[in-house]
Amino acid sequence: MKYVLIIHEVTDYIIWKRIFDSATIIRKEAGEQSYQIFKYENEPNKIVHLSVWSSLEKAKHFFQSPELVQIRAKAGVQSPDFIYLEQLETGFYNQ
């Protein structure tokens, strides 16, 4: 599986989330298959976005697009870090 891990700070989580949700269709059309949103334990505006993509090339193209740069600015995203990952292994433990 192909993953993108994004770590960034936002000015206001509620505003960011509203804009993030409004971009669902364009993310899906670009190749995002699923996502999870996390926050740092004691920093509510420090966001981690982990998503599964159909390909890392599509993800890179999407995240570097001028349209998304504008969306990030509107959403108050500060200094995003993008990490492109290929899954090697998954493990589960029986309980």
Predicted regions and their residues:
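Glycine-rich beta-strand-turn "strand-cap" elements at beta-sheet edges
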Residues: 2, 30-48, 70-95
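Short, well-ordered beta-strand segments in beta-rich or mixed alpha/beta enzyme
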Residues: 2-9, 36-65
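Compositionally biased, low-structure terminal segments
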Residues: 21, 63-64, 83, 93
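Generic structural motif
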Residues: 11-13, 56, 87-88
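Short amphipathic alpha-helical segments
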Residues: 12-36, 67-70
